[in-house]
Amino acid sequence: MLTSDLRLLFLDFFAKRGHKVSPSASLISNDPSVMFTIAGMLPFIQCFLALEPPPHPRVVSVQKCIRTSDIDEVGKTPRHGTFFQMMGNFSFGDYFKKEAIEYAWEFLLSELDLAPDRLWVTIHGDDKESEKFWLLCGVPQERVQSLDSNFWSTGKAGPAGPCSEVFYDLHGGPGPGPEGDPDRYLEVWNLVFMQNLRDNDGHIISSLPKKCVDTGMGLERIAMITQGVGTIYDTDELKPILDEAGYISGKRYGKDRRDDISLRVLADHIRSSLMLVADGLRPSNEGRGYILRRLLRRSVRAAKLLGIQENCFDQLFAKAAQVMKVGYPELEGKLAEIKQVACLEEQSFSRALNAGTQLLSRSMSSSKKRVSGDLAFRLHDTHGFPIDLITEIAKDSGLDVDMDGFFTLMKEQKDRSRAALSRSKPIVSDTTGYEGLRSNFLGYEMLQVDTKITALVKDGTILTSAKQGDCVDIALEQTPFYATAGGQEADRGFIESDNFSGKVVTVFSPLPGLTVHRCEIVSGLVVSGEVVRASVDSANRFAACQSHTATHVIHAVVREMFGSTSVQMGSYNRAGYLRFDFSCSYAPTDSQRIELEERANRAIQSCLEISSTYTTLEKAVASGAIALFGERYGDTVRMVEIGGPWSRELCAGTHLRNSSEIAVVSLVSETSVASGIRRVECLTGFDAFSHFAQERALVDTVMRTLGATRQEMEGAIDDLRENLKRSKHALQTAKDKFLSAFAPRLLQEFKSVSSVRILIADLSKFLSGPLFSPFEFTAEDIRAVTLRCKKLLEEPHVLLLAAVISGRVHAACSIDLSSVKLSCMDDLSANNLIKVFLKTLDGSGGGRADFAQGAGWNAKLLDSALDNLKACVIGKLSGV
């Protein structure tokens, strides 16, 4: 039976028995305590907790789920996968154990035609009711096992109850049951009976007034049974993806265990990524987006392990969508966008994987037993390697990873980020003094409000008053001040009365519905409870509105130019300045940057009306409003429109009334901030005009310097560039001649030991002084001098030259002992010598027996490393 048929069969079975069919919720859970929807009951958790009414007393669903806790086991076992579909029927105070058990048994036997002698049941030891109902269904007593672990709870105070599980015997015949051999018996259905209420200590304190049923049956597992295959990867929704990967790679599934693991990883991770991107997730370096990035990057490595050198995501995602669209038809319309997101990640990480793998390989070849924490951090931070991927690659080579060192460096990086953040944003973790307080925000309509102080707080301490020179947090009944939120910087201004004056330096929201003003008391004495006047700096507010409205304009233009796949990844705006991050698979060209700025200013000059309305989230999204991914919205949302449908976004920030009030936008920077994420920075209003004036002044200075008119400038710069190119070439030619002439002089520095000429030295010590100052020496110069000396020497020699260049030690080694017979010949090869030398400098190198080169990181040890190597070589040549 096809998986799609199983899905429909299950829904139809329970629909005929009075259940309302509930569509699958998004994989992106609304529960902040979990990253993804990990169980069929999760969308109904508020109903089970009696915090929301259920959609119907009886519900049935097939829920998309993602679990990555066992991601390392994916591909290695027949049952582990990250994406799965959970079929479930639910009762909210309607039926209970008897009906749930009867429904389950009837579906398994009558609808799926499973052999009853292959089915086993487990119950909680104290749940005699469930045992009785299973026996009444015809399950033999010996196939009902009691397990104390069959008890479900939320893990905290709340509903709880016993559960009953149905297992399928994969082998058949006599056996010990699930308790005795868990690998032989596959759990297919779990029936949870919520009947108790537990306290925080886990003690049952009462029975629930309404008993509920929550069941879950894995669609992939039951498909595995009904299709008669040995693993979930052989079922009809995963096997086609796996076969496509096999076709691309030329690998045959079932022939090689390591290849089989990679094929399974590809099949699972591609399908999981397909469904996550379809639900709106995008790769990033934190939270849910990082999990998606891990899945995609593990897929890239799996493809490389299979020998796939070309990009393959386009083909694999198309196959996955073709298979999954039967159950999820919305995939067809989203496929182009999904492939664009996935292929971008594939392209960027393929390059990083090659560079990072080479770095990791050099570490592995240096006879070290482990990957250092520093190297792991560099791979993670610079090349984007997820740490689990680093440990996986290291494990394949028999190495471990210095995780303590890695996490120490990660913590230092996070501490630096937090320190930077704390300098720009007030972080209030202690909400003492604010409990129960609310403030009414009037700042959309008013910039000045007469109101009352409801609290004075300093460092978590409630004050009755504050004097001149104090910095204190003030809560008001009503406020016109906008708090830092949604990327918009807080308002500035003053809070004053006849008794004091306080300068508002920032505004924040420590609790939902509460605005707090951090004030420097400029004069007088402020007393809690007094009536004050709160006044926003109107010029600063207007300039902030210019930037925020311009951010929406830039967003709309970005989507016009780069497509709907270019979604907002972050923003920041303050008076005169905006920063906007968006997803894009490539670096925009110079002409596209110019076009972006021109389009934005054209929209500004079009005098587009700006309005805001309150509506439901459902209606806003249906009208085309952009809801930013990762933001949490209530049932009622504020929708800001610019030019009607041209720009519609859910936004609580402050805005202008007409686009023309922005005046002008100047795009001053466009850069990459992460893989697949671009950033534009713009100036707005007066700051933009000021920037234009500075640019004109700079152009005038360049014109005077070049002695050219504005029309002649480009040609003059080209001439200057060509002259510079010729000068560099002449300087390089002079340097080459100088080094060629310098090499014979260097021969005078050689010493003789056992008829072998030796020079092991820091080359920079011979290249100092005014004669050498015009030249900038490179690693290639060290190589060139070494090879020149090698050519000039007509006798046995050991030559190693090193120098510190840009903080790293670069070295080259030449050895010729062909005409002498020494017992140390095997040890004294250039390849061995360069490796021994650079290992002491935390570096690596290699080459041939007669010539080798490389680099090291620890420049401080250069002198001692040269002395030690020289002593070692002399000792070997002397027979010591």
From Swiss-Prot:
SMART domains: tRNA_SAD. Signal peptide: none annotated. Its EC number is 6.1.1.7. Consists of three domains; the N-terminal catalytic domain, the editing domain and the C-terminal C-Ala domain. The editing domain removes incorrectly charged amino acids, while the C-Ala domain, along with tRNA(Ala), serves as a bridge to cooperatively bring together the editing and aminoacylation centers thus stimulating deacylation of misacylated tRNAs. Its main location: cytoplasm. Keywords: Aminoacyl-tRNA synthetase, ATP-binding, Cytoplasm, Ligase, Metal-binding, Nucleotide-binding, Protein biosynthesis, RNA-binding, tRNA-binding, Zinc. Binds 1 zinc ion per subunit. GO terms for cellular component: cytosol. This is Alanine--tRNA ligase. One of its GO terms (biological process) is alanyl-tRNA aminoacylation. Gene3D superfamilies: 2.40.30.130, 3.10.310.40, 3.30.54.20, Bira Bifunctional Protein, Domain 2 (3.30.930.10), Threonyl-trna Synthetase, Chain A, domain 2 (3.30.980.10). Belongs to the class-II aminoacyl-tRNA synthetase family. It comes from Tropheryma whipplei (strain Twist). InterPro entries: aa-tRNA-synth_II/BPL/LPL, Ala-tRNA-lgiase_IIc, Ala-tRNA-ligase_IIc_anticod-bd, Ala-tRNA-synth_IIc_core, Ala-tRNA-synth_IIc_N, Ala-tRNA_ligase, Ala_tRNA_ligase_euk/bac, DHHA1_dom. The lineage of its organism: Bacteria, Bacillati, Actinomycetota, Actinomycetes, Micrococcales. It catalyses: tRNA(Ala) + L-alanine + ATP = L-alanyl-tRNA(Ala) + AMP + diphosphate. HAMAP family: Ala_tRNA_synth_B (MF_00036_B). Its cofactor is Zn(2+). PROSITE patterns: AA_TRNA_LIGASE_II_ALA. It is found in: Cytoplasm. Catalyzes the attachment of alanine to tRNA(Ala) in a two-step reaction: alanine is first activated by ATP to form Ala-AMP and then transferred to the acceptor end of tRNA(Ala). Also edits incorrectly charged Ser-tRNA(Ala) and Gly-tRNA(Ala) via its editing domain. Zn(2+) binds at H548, H552, C651, H655. The gene is alaS. The keyword ATP-binding applies. PANTHER family: ALANINE--TRNA LIGASE, CYTOPLASMIC, ALANYL-TRNA SYNTHETASE.
